[in-house]
Amino acid sequence: MAELPLAPIERIIRRSGGEIRVSEDATIALRDILEEKAVEIAERAAKLARHAGRKTIKASDIKLAK
């Protein structure tokens, strides 16, 4: 997988923890979890769109799928 860039994820971790260092392993672990969760949500959203007779996933599908 590994499609999300690490830098923004590291910034998110640092912002959440204050003045703390973040290991590359921690950043990679969070990236992997976020990508996995994103795929799960996207798959559920696609099912919702198909069920509604649409070929386009809308923001409302994503919100319902989360």
Language-model features: locations:
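Histone-fold and other basic nucleic-acid-binding segments
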Residues: M1-K66
